Amino acid sequence: MATVTAALVKELRERTAAGMMECKKALVAAEGDIELAIENMRKSGAAKAAKKAGNVAAEGAIIIKEEAGVAALLEVNCQTDFVAKDAGFLAFANEVAEVALAERLDIVALQAKFEDARIALVTKIGENISIRRVELVEGVALASYRHGEKIGVVVAGEGEAETLKHIAMHVAASKPEYVNPSDVPADVVEKEKAVQVEIAMNEGKPQEIAEKMVIGRMKKFTGEVSLTGQAFIMEPKKTVADILKEKGASVTTFVRLEVGEGIEKAAEMSFADEVAAVQKG
């Protein structure tokens, strides 16, 4: 049996980021062959990651990376808020975002590129990790805003940096779905209109009054779901359109990501339960 030296264990730790005892065990099993040990650890890690894949990963972080004219927004998920704050998890998420920006990768290419690193992180941390979404935003002028690490926004348009930054903050808080009322898709408008017509008819209003009510309610609806039609959070008596006009600014597009959107979350765990879950693996 080959001797497993401390130097060999140290090298394996540096190359895999695995724990000391795990590295020693792998080297003993591989009879001191570090390349075989790494191969075996990767196979073991892939098996563990496959078992974790069914676990709901609805926590995590939103990362934003920017360079001239382009920004990348990334969502990386884990199972618990405890792990979402882990330095290793955040380092992984930041590296993925940097590569997404530098290489302009879509989500499929990004997931493929980082699959080995993801498996290694799952093995180390003991939770399911998912590279869920990436959005690339281009524009003449860009502004970004992150609310903690849970919400991220990038706004593209024209105007002063401070103005666009405030618009990004508004998007984070108010969750508009479209830039302008006219951008609301026809099918969405028709669906809402049908609802409002039924409501008006059920209220027993005369047809002429009901039609006017529906027109008013639809104008309100398209305003509420669009950025420029919303009341500006910092000056509620004005709309975002008013603010943009005053500042000589405009918005062409925006992207807002929030951790866990659309994912059905499991019952919330206490902090103690989260720690216990991480320790159990």
From Swiss-Prot:
One of its GO terms (molecular function) is translation elongation factor activity. InterPro entries: EF-Ts_dimer_sf (IPR036402), Transl_elong_EFTs/EF1B (IPR001816), Transl_elong_EFTs/EF1B_dimer (IPR014039), Transl_elong_Ts_CS (IPR018101), UBA-like_sf (IPR009060). Pfam families: EF_TS. One of its GO terms (cellular component) is cytoplasm. Residues 80-83 are annotated as: Involved in Mg(2+) ion dislocation from EF-Tu. Keywords: Cytoplasm, Elongation factor, Protein biosynthesis. It is found in: Cytoplasm. HAMAP family: EF_Ts (MF_00050). Belongs to the EF-Ts family. Associates with the EF-Tu.GDP complex and induces the exchange of GDP to GTP. It remains bound to the aminoacyl-tRNA.EF-Tu.GTP complex up to the GTP hydrolysis stage on the ribosome. This is Elongation factor Ts. It comes from Vibrio atlanticus (strain LGP32). The lineage of its organism: Bacteria, Pseudomonadati, Pseudomonadota, Gammaproteobacteria, Vibrionales. The gene is tsf.
